[in-house]
Design a protein with these regions (language model features):
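N-terminal membrane-proximal hinge/A-helix region immediately C-terminal to the signal-anchor transmembrane segment
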Residues: 2-116, 121-130, 145, 149-158, ...
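Cytochrome P450 heme-thiolate monooxygenase catalytic core
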Residues: 100-109, 143-305
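Cytochrome P450 heme-thiolate "Cys pocket" and heme-binding signature region
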Residues: 116-119, 291, 296, 336-340, ...
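Short, small-residue alpha-helix embedded
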Residues: 300-313, 454
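Conserved cytochrome P450 K-helix/beta-meander segment immediately N-terminal to the heme-binding cysteine loop
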Residues: 96-97, 387-421
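C-terminal helix/juxtamembrane-tail motif
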Residues: 2-4, 480-494
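Cytochrome P450 I-helix active-site segment
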Residues: 34-36, 201-205, 259-267, 310-359, ...
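Cytochrome P450 heme-binding "Cys pocket" and the immediately downstream C-terminal segment
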Residues: 316-318, 440, 444-481
Length: 494
């Protein structure tokens, strides 16, 4: 009996030691000449309320900036996190070596994998080419901005009503409703009715599902999803209900808008449904790509608008100069061609994206074979590699000593100058808010349309400033943006 207990204790100690070694130290075959970020860095948001910019400054900024890459524990494994623009450019250029590898590969047993599956963002190889053939024409066509202008008018009305009722506006939930409306009505050819009701089903689902999907405990220790815990079973149930509701809502908006299989030159929703009806996509592929379109199609524009409003609220001089530029067009609803010609408007959007990229950190690439990053960092096959866009976009060597400051004029004063700098920064890996290479953001064109029209409407009809009672803090984890941003709006008449 005593011998059995001793054997059990020795085994328990051995297993515990092995787990701790695995968690606290990178694998022995990882590169030795780049810093290791303390294991607990990823866990700090679990134990106390943090501002993730403060955490970045304290733990990540110096080693990442000085070495260009670090070893980072995230998502239940050790990864290589890249920051140096030249390294970023190499990763983005060589997609066959640094292959996309999403949650369906990384944590196939996880709730998050059940939610997103394989999709246009996470797929690699032939499946990605298949999805891209459906998405690209649906996202990159010239959409009529009329619906966005109409929704922007509803947005201004909501801001007015909230300002009058509460004395300030928490803009984040309102902007979520707004970007969901644009996604559904413009890209998906349906309507989620999120601007008409704060309790619209898909908006309510999002409020329920986000805390379950992005629970930091399960994000950092995804092996726990192997356990059939009641809370995770409930999360899986909500995922299935949300997926069914999303597909049903989009399908209902297309009952008379297209003939079976006639998806060419149609909106994205029509193309996805037609691809499913003709057998190009399976039901699972339709569902996962619909989820991907839903998430990227509203969250990224929402985060861009939050950051732009935040920066313009802090810099009211730039806000006023932007108002002057827009007023020079002589109308409250300019043509989109005229909006595209405005240098300051474009520069404000790019500068907002530079300082606060909607996806501030992304680790979703996996090496297909051993590689020497930058000719000097050996990375084994099967290693997950990611990048920190928040850090890379503030690279002093490219952007200068004022890289931390909001300065739209750095982009140039003419559209030719701005476009040239945009192309150069992208090519050099110094501006990666839209990622880059073959896998650059397919929704960039629509995101710019939505941002231009929305900011034009808001700047021409309202002025805003930061609510003095708002505590200036960024989110503790996940997407990096102003937490619970509260602004005071004043309507401009005439």
């Amino acid at each position: 009996m005593l011998l059995t207990i001793c054997v059990f204790l020795v085994a328990l100690i051995g297993i515990t030691t092995a787990v701790l070694v695995y968690l606290f130290t990178p694998p022995s075959h990882f590169p030795k000449d780049i810093p290791t970020i303390p294991f607990y860095y990823a866990l700090l948001p679990l134990v106390r309320d943090n501002d993730q910019v403060d955490l970045y400054r304290k733990y990540l900024e110096r080693p990442l900036t000085e070495s260009g890459a670090v070893k980072l524990f995230f998502g239940g494994r050790w990864n290589i996190l890249v920051r140096k623009p030249a390294y970023i450019a190499e990763v983005l250029k060589n997609e066959d070596i640094y292959a996309k590898s999403g949650n369906q590969v990384k944590i196939p047993h996880g709730v998050l994998a059940e939610y997103t599956g394989e999709n246009i963002i996470s797929a690699h190889g032939e499946n990605w080419k298949l999805y891209a053939s459906i998405f690209k024409p649906g996202l990159q066509q010239d959409y009529d901005p009329a619906r966005v202008w109409s929704n922007a008018s509803l947005l201004v009305r909501l801001l007015d009503e909230t300002q009058a009722a509460e004395g300030a506006v928490n803009v984040n939930p309102i902007l979520q409703r707004y970007t969901l409306a644009n996604l559904s009505e413009v890209l998906l050819g349906s309507t989620f009715e999120t601007l008409q009701s704060p309790n619209a089903p898909l908006h309510a689902f999002q409020l329920r599902i986000k805390p379950k999907i992005f629970d930091p405990v399960f994000l950092n220790f995804p092996f726990l999803d192997h356990l059939k815990l009641p809370t995770r079973q409930e999360a899986r149930k909500v995922v299935r209900e949300f997926t069914d509701e999303l597909c049903r809502t989009v399908q209902s908006g297309h009952s008379t808008c297209h003939e079976k299989g006639q998806h060419k030159h149609k909106n994205l929703g029509c193309r996805l449904l037609s691809a499913f009806e003709t057998g190009i996509l399976t039901e699972k592929q339709l569902q996962h790509n619909m989820i991907s379109a839903f998430l990227a199609g509203h969250e990224n524009p929402q985060l861009l608008l939050i950051s732009a409003l935040f920066l313009l609220a802090e810099d009211t001089d730039t806000q006023e100069r932007l108002r002057t530029e827009l007023s020079s067009l002589g109308t409250r609803e300019p043509s989109y061609a005229d909006l595209q010609s405005l240098p300051l408007l474009t520069a404000v959007i790019y500068e907002s994206l530079r300082l606060y990229p909607p996806i501030s950190q992304l680790i979703n690439r996996r090496t297909t074979h051993p590689v020497l990053l930058g000719g000097k960092i050996p990375i084994p096959a099967g290693t997950y590699v990611g990048y920190n866009a928040y850090s890379t976009n503030r690279d002093v060597e490219f952007w200068g000593e004022t890289a931390e400051e909001f300065n739209p004029e750095r982009w140039g004063t003419t559209m030719d100058e701005i476009n040239a700098l945009f192309r150069r920064a992208n090519a050099r890996g110094s501006f990666i808010s839209f990622h880059g290479g073959r896998r650059a953001c397919l929704g960039q064109k629509f995101a710019m349309l939505e941002a231009r029209v929305t900011l034009a409407k808001l700047v021409l009809e309202t002025a805003w400033e930061v609510d003095p009672l708002w505590v200036r803090r960024m989110t503790p984890a996940g997407p990096l943006y102003a937490r619970n941003l509260r602004l005071r709006f004043c309507r401009i008449r005439g």
